[in-house]
UniProtKB/Swiss-Prot annotation:
GO CC terms, sorted: cytoplasm
Compartment list: Cytoplasm
Entry annotated with the keyword Cytoplasm: yes
Lineage: Bacteria, Pseudomonadati, Bacteroidota, Bacteroidia, Bacteroidales
Transmembrane stretches, start-end: none
Alphabetical list of Pfam families matching this protein: HGTP_anticodon, tRNA-synt_His
SUPFAM superfamilies: Class II aaRS ABD-related (SSF52954), Class II aaRS and biotin synthetases (SSF55681)
Catalysed reactions listed for this entry: tRNA(His) + L-histidine + ATP = L-histidyl-tRNA(His) + AMP + diphosphate + H(+)
Protein name: Histidine--tRNA ligase
UniProt xrefs under InterPro entries: aa-tRNA-synth_II, aa-tRNA-synth_II/BPL/LPL, Anticodon-bd, Anticodon-bd_dom_sf, His-tRNA-ligase, HisRS-like_core, HisRS/HisZ, HisRS_anticodon
Any one GO MF annotation of this record: histidine-tRNA ligase activity
Family: Belongs to the class-II aminoacyl-tRNA synthetase family.
Subunit structure: Homodimer.
Amino acid sequence: MQKPSIPKGTRDFSPEEMAKRNYIFNTIREVFHLYGFQQIETPAMENLSTLMGKYGEEGDKLLFKILNSGDCFAGISDEELMEKNPLRFAAKACEKGLRYDLTVPFARYVVQHRNEISFPFKRYQIQPVWRADRPQKGRYREFYQCDGDVVGSDSLINEVELIQIMDEVFHRFGIRVCIKMNNRKILSGIAEIIGEADKIVDITVAIDKLDKIGLDNVNEELRSKGLPEEAIERLQPIIMLQGSNQEKIATLKKVLSASETGLKGVAELDFILERISHTSIRAELELDLTLARGLNYYTGAIFEVKALDVQIGSITGGGRYDNLTGVFGMEGVSGVGFSFGADRIFDVLNQLDLYPEGSLKTTQLLFVNFGQKEEIHLLPLIAKVRKAGIRTELYPESTKMKKQMGYADAKKIPFVAIVGENEMAENKINLKNMLTGEQTLVTIEELIERF
């Protein structure tokens, strides 16, 4: 008989892992609600016409396509089958696919429900996505995304609030972070003033690797992309700019004085930093001119969050974008959004052991089962305990005490309630602390007060 297994690139989550994941998602939800965000969900499957062409040719290959039910070969000729062209086959045999991310379904949602939505629309979404990628360490075919966006508003106050949300979430987790920020317009201005505006993608892809590969290798990559030495020399002092955020802003105003686009980006960052100075954020906030994520997507501010006490990639990222819904025929809907990296946050909290003790325990109290007479006596007591909000179990069978205690140990249940004939006669409960072994005779009211 074949041993049961799961597809490569997917995961099972144990009760303990789910308790940790729920702590992460519930914390994020609470903060989103504080800022007026509303939750939506979209179907796991979308029409392929919604998904195809939105992620580039490589992205289209990574879409999980769903075969049409019934005769999926209907309308496909023998010649087309013999051709063995997967994309052409999928175009006829598949009308639906699993969502690749939460952004395109969100854009579809906004267009489809535009008459019901109040703009600006603050939305968050926590759902799994699927990618037909090659599984490897840290890369999965099924994983959760946790996105927040404000659409239908150009106000930079939205960027300020997103920084506050990131700061509050990581403060609640107890993770020390640095929130890095840049602006797509500044990157365009830099490429413009060094005379290489048409090579902005090559420039930004290279400088984004500065932390990982060092300046010499960045320069070598720029040379390989055809940048002249003069342009590379002019770029050096800009990307290596030091000082406080305000000192960097002052320098950029001078350096980018000949670029209208660049100066607009500087003004936007200056506004965000000035407004943030009137809040009480605890995270480090750093203007990083090498930050260049999502270049083909973001049009204004760019954000990235790094954990300070763990060597790991970014744990949150986002930015300002224009025309989110243009691909669906609704022009001019701009917004700003970001995504929490749930799996990386999970890893950071594990490495730093930052999960609050109460967040991981399911059952707080186990009642030992001695038999039918005791069960009848215990059921109203257990109902009273649960009504007080104490997570409680009654062991389902009257088996050996050792087995019941072993169950409590295995589930890390901190307290066990023992009610035998003597306790029933006195209308008391023998409460055992499983950590210390201490036992105390208490009334039901005294038991409830202890939790």
